[in-house]
Amino acid sequence: MVDYIVEYDYDAVHDDELTIRVGEIIRNVKKLQEEGWLEGELNGRRGMFPDNFVKEIKRETEFKDDSLPIKRERHGNVASLVQRISTYGLPAGGIQPHPQTKNIKKKTKKRQCKVLFEYIPQNEDELELKVGDIIDINEEVEEGWWSGTLNNKLGLFPSNFVKELEVTDDGETHEAQDDSETVLAGPTSPIPSLGNVSETASGSVTQPKKIRGIGFGDIFKEGSVKLRTRTSSSETEEKKPEKPLILQSLGPKTQSVEITKTDTEGKIKAKEYCRTLFAYEGTNEDELTFKEGEIIHLISKETGEAGWWRGELNGKEGVFPDNFAVQINELDKDFPKPKKPPPPAKAPAPKPELIAAEKKYFSLKPEEKDEKSTLEQKPSKPAAPQVPPKKPTPPTKASNLLRSSGTVYPKRPEKPVPPPPPIAKINGEVSSISSKFETEPVSKLKLDSEQLPLRPKSVDFDSLTVRTSKETDVVNFDDIASSENLLHLTANRPKMPGRRLPGRFNGGHSPTHSPEKILKLPKEEDSANLKPSELKKDTCYSPKPSVYLSTPSSASKANTTAFLTPLEIKAKVETDDVKKNSLDELRAQIIELLCIVEALKKDHGKELEKLRKDLEEEKTMRSNLEMEIEKLKKAVLSS
């Protein structure tokens, strides 16, 4: 059975699962058929747990617990010898003496490293590093991250922020000497073995102690052997500019451990800030408005909408688009630190969401300085990116914004106000009337044009016009005096084909009414309906007959047409319009129906032709079939 150590917290979802916490040891672990899950025993209870939340405890870590069997070797009993051979194996040169075992014990005792750069923890299980601190290395958790103890606190820290120290026989720690021609390599895994010296830190060249007298000879005189170095190309590139800083920051050979910071101080996280790259004006009440170069306190990156962050600026809290700002750090703005990669995604989909702590890599200071210099050397600022889409704005907000910005929606156009009644001109002319009168018959216009005389009483006409324009409140049709017909100046002009002149009307009234008259149309209609006979009498038996009329019949017709009131003319025009419109509609419908009937006739004819053809084909087929039957009958009878 294999043991595993818990790297991330996990809360059980089902009854057959284990709830595990960071640092716990799960015993007697075995793999299950289901991919991504293991089964083990914890606190007397056996259950399942995801394999990407734990790490297998390797055999090398058990050497620390074997101190008691090593002490028994001093007594020289056979049991200790058998245990030592089964643990370490039988060397090629024979059984080693006891002094060599003591050296191995001392060399595998501890690994220590010295902090070269400050590091602020981003998660609870990480250590806060200060320059010059000495950390006891426990193990390499994963590539780029080590587990160690600092100030009696166990936690994780990035391996590229420290430098491993060399441990001598006397238990003293010394910094590994940097050769000017060597390049720093990645961290190595501690793997103790018989007849071998401990690994050197970061692949630097040191002067190892020579091993003699155990049957191997002086085969390590050129230097120590590197075991299982896992140096990626990207890691070596990241660490190349680190060398001059390391050379400058190297202090004395030994330093005492500084215990100045408490655990609570190590858990304080730095505030996050953003620097705006482009100006932005908020379109909603919950959005921030900022200019280029302002610093926004970043509160949260999770707002429920992709592409939006929540922050605070000038005491106002709101959301803003993340592509208009770049994140900076308040405590350490010089460089962003490397992220730790997440654990392998072997477990089912929901399980990685339960990871409580996710490590982050942070790049080194020199790289950030280089990036900063390249940003400052950019020739021109890029164009502002497009604002990401946001949730639709409620109608009330949109209307308020439109009102505040001064935008007014266009209203429905009102009816135009009719012009004031025409005033008689010097020569007795009257302005042209509305186009509604164009619908009157052409014959009527011709009749009037033939009977148009000169106006003998211009003074009476002017007085009537002034009087009717003043009497807007009360209209009495009995007071209207008869007068001779008037001829418009454009009546004798050549006419375009299909166009008609406006109709004739009483000279005392204008066809265009003021708004007050339009409002009082019902009263006028009532008065007109009350005395139509009186109006006819007055018009037919006028005391002032026209001397210009040729016959009495034509005079009566002219008078009846001349003394039509504006209301009657308007009603007549409206009825004519309605009749004409309805007539046009009926004509269009009739034409459409005729087209439909013609189309149906054509389709019906085609169907009939098709049926006739089918019928003919059926007849021929039937006749052929009957002939075949007759032939078969004859053949049967003849046989």
Curated annotation (Swiss-Prot):
Q: What is this protein called?
A: CD2-associated protein
Localization annotation: Cytoplasm, Cytoskeleton; Cell projection, Ruffle; Cell junction
Keywords tagged on the record: Cell cycle, Cell division, Cell junction, Cell projection, Coiled coil, Cytoplasm, Cytoskeleton, Host-virus interaction, Isopeptide bond, Mitosis, Phosphoprotein, Repeat, SH3 domain, SH3-binding, Ubl conjugation
Q: Which residues carry this modification: Phosphoserine?
A: 67, 80, 86, 224, 458, 463, 469, 510, 514, 582
Q: How does it assemble?
A: Homodimer. Interacts with F-actin, PKD2, NPHS1 and NPHS2. Interacts with WTIP. Interacts with DDN; interaction is direct. Interacts (via SH3 2 domain) with CBL (via phosphorylated C-terminus). Interacts with BCAR1/p130Cas (via SH3 domain). Interacts with MVB12A and ARHGAP17. Interacts with ANLN, CD2 and CBLB. Interacts with PDCD6IP and TSG101. Interacts with RIN3. Interacts directly with RET (inactive) and CBLC; upon RET activation by GDNF suggested to dissociate from RET as CBLC:CD2AP complex. Interacts with CGNL1 and SH3BP1; probably part of a complex at cell junctions.
Q: Where does the record place the modification Phosphothreonine?
A: 565
**From start to end residue, where is composition biased (Basic and acidic residues)?**
168-177, 356-379
User: Which Gene Ontology MF annotations are present?
Assistant: actin filament binding; cadherin binding; clathrin binding; identical protein binding; phosphatidylinositol 3-kinase regulatory subunit binding; SH3 domain binding; structural constituent of cytoskeleton
Q: Where is this region: Interaction with ANLN and localization to the midbody?
A: 1-175
Instruction: State the disease linkage annotated in the record.
Output: Focal segmental glomerulosclerosis 3: A renal pathology defined by the presence of segmental sclerosis in glomeruli and resulting in proteinuria, reduced glomerular filtration rate and progressive decline in renal function. Renal insufficiency often progresses to end-stage renal disease, a highly morbid state requiring either dialysis therapy or kidney transplantation.
Check the record and name the Pfam families matching this protein.
SH3_1, SH3_9
- Return the SUPFAM superfamilies for the record: SH3-domain
* Gene Ontology, cellular component aspect: actin cytoskeleton; axon; cell leading edge; centriolar satellite; cytoplasm; dendrite; extracellular exosome; fibrillar center
Q: Where is the composition biased (Pro residues)?
A: 341-351, 385-395
The beginning of the lineage is:
Eukaryota, Metazoa, Chordata, Craniata, Vertebrata
**Predominant subcellular localization, coarse grouping:** cytoplasm
Segments forming a coiled coil: 577-638
Give the protein's biological function. Answer: Seems to act as an adapter protein between membrane proteins and the actin cytoskeleton. In collaboration with CBLC, modulates the rate of RET turnover and may act as regulatory checkpoint that limits the potency of GDNF on neuronal survival. Controls CBLC function, converting it from an inhibitor to a promoter of RET degradation. May play a role in receptor clustering and cytoskeletal polarity in the junction between T-cell and antigen-presenting cell. May anchor the podocyte slit diaphragm to the actin cytoskeleton in renal glomerolus. Also required for cytokinesis.
Which biological processes are named by the entry's GO terms? Answer: actin filament organization; actin filament polymerization; adipose tissue development; apoptotic process; cell division; cell migration; cell population proliferation; cell-cell adhesion mediated by cadherin
Q: Where is this cross-link: Glycyl lysine isopeptide (Lys-Gly) (interchain with G-Cter in SUMO2)?
A: 58, 523
Which organism's genome codes for this protein? Homo sapiens
| Domain (SH3) ranges | 1-59, 108-167, 269-330
Q: In which tissues is it expressed?
A: Widely expressed in fetal and adult tissues.
Q: Where is this motif: SH3-binding?
A: 336-352, 378-397, 410-422
Q: What is known of its domains?
A: The Pro-rich domain may mediate binding to SH3 domains.
- Please describe the post-translational modifications of this protein: Phosphorylated on tyrosine residues; probably by c-Abl, Fyn and c-Src.
Q: Which intervals of the chain are annotated as region Disordered?
A: 168-209, 227-256, 333-428
Please note every region of biased composition (Polar residues).
195-207
